[in-house]
Amino acid sequence: MGFCFSKFGKSQTHEIPISSSSDSSPPHHYQPLPKPTVSQGQTSNPTSNPQPKPKPAPPPPPSTSSGSQIGPILNRPMIDLSALYDLHKELGRGQFGITYKCTDKSNGREYACKSISKRKLIRRKDIEDVRREVMILQHLTGQPNIVEFRGAYEDKDNLHLVMELCSGGELFDRIIKKGSYSEKEAANIFRQIVNVVHVCHFMGVVHRDLKPENFLLVSNEEDSPIKATDFGLSVFIEEGKVYRDIVGSAYYVAPEVLHRNYGKEIDVWSAGVMLYILLSGVPPFWGETEKTIFEAILEGKLDLETSPWPTISESAKDLIRKMLIRDPKKRITAAEALEHPWMTDTKISDKPINSAVLVRMKQFRAMNKLKKLALKVIAENLSEEEIKGLKQTFKNMDTDESGTITFDELRNGLHRLGSKLTESEIKQLMEAADVDKSGTIDYIEFVTATMHRHRLEKEENLIEAFKYFDKDRSGFITRDELKHSMTEYGMGDDATIDEVINDVDTDNDGRINYEEFVAMMRKGTTDSDPKLIR
């Protein structure tokens, strides 16, 4: 028989049956949750709008004159967004800005644009938070369950973040509309959620605000994938650092957050709360106010006995228990959760997934050799802040802590990210990234091969890379300068030099000027280029 939880607010009176055990199990009801949040500044997510297919490649950044004003947020020349995109209807509004639907003027494709008012970024911390959000979006884009980031643009009044438009609405809105689903369907949804946590942690990011509202459906199709959005509270993981600020949304906050002493394990807790809600319709710890919710979380009484739990599999309940263990050191990891029997026994699709790291390495393999060396120069000059996430990814792959990644470590690391590449394909990636042909990938080579191509938007990075080759500061890279620089890496043979010059020297004067160099570096910089994804 059905039942209804009305403790979430007197205004919610409708009952929606959801079958969560098997197709024949008795239905239970999903009661929409109120949204008490701990932190401010959350922007609303886009709702139903058409989603273009296939996924487009970003246009090259618009040219800017040397006299362009440098924006204080992004530290690069300011750009008039209206030259690139038309803004349309408002999709959501938050403390700092507004999200609009927008259209790319070059091809008519639709995206979401989060416009943040610079005058509302009063504190230095506000600016640092926005910069970090941009860096994390750049770092994580390309993952199958993370919203695609198109670019960040700054003008006199606003910072604009352009990203994929997810037109299917919020995850739980879809569940409410559907009315019922099976435990198997819940597992299919939940695997995507846990995969986001796993990939974030593997790539050195803790989300800190996982909740159903931050997962959107790509389209209105029945089998639409879901995407994680809103990384405004996310941070790069710093080895040994303990976080003390209370962030997140009340129902999903881990107990150690309330104790102001936590790490990445809080994301697993939040995901566990989401699974509990998926299977029961209510959160495990509830209250009428934030205070009473927090008290329930700290008290920690987990109910897996009363209805509907007798109809739900022991395997599902075992996973919930392991994700909601109060001691974060004993809590299951996201990687372990993905291997839990409840996740693996439901015959979820085994379709290969291309991780962002893998896609970038495939791109890198396709680049000409001058571009590879130039990227290495850029990588060597990036700040610790800019490569924080990649540093953690490298450490996760370098399992023997030797300071280099072997073929076996690369293969195992890509496998943990969901790759199904063959031995020969991984060998090709290895050879492409191993610039000095040592047989292993060192830290700089790894950063070179996997850093996000948004780094190429920074003029100062391109200038420094050009100077590395232009030894006499003539404004041109001559054949001799090219040969000298490339010989250091065993690439200085005449055939390679001819190949590079023929590819880059578009005005056929036998040398490479700065404009030709920049065009080469910015060519094909999307992480979603279908030609580079197998």
From Swiss-Prot:
Gene name as annotated: CPK29
Lipidated positions per record (N-myristoyl glycine): 2
Residues annotated as domain Protein kinase: 85-343
CDD domains found in the cross-reference section: EFh (cd00051), STKc_CAMK (cd05117)
Name of the featured protein: Calcium-dependent protein kinase 29
Chain sites annotated for binding Ca(2+) 2: 434, 436, 438, 440, 445
Record-level GO cellular component terms: cytoplasm; mitochondrion; nucleus; plasma membrane
Organism the protein comes from: Arabidopsis thaliana
Residues in EF-hand domain copies: 385-420, 421-456, 457-492, 493-527
Residue positions binding Ca(2+) 4: 505, 507, 509, 511, 516
Keywords tagged on the record: ATP-binding, Calcium, Kinase, Lipoprotein, Membrane, Metal-binding, Myristate, Nucleotide-binding, Phosphoprotein, Repeat, Serine/threonine-protein kinase, Transferase
Region (Disordered): 1-72
SMART domains: EFh, S_TKc
GO MF term (any one): protein serine/threonine kinase activity
List of residues binding Ca(2+) 3: 470, 472, 474, 481
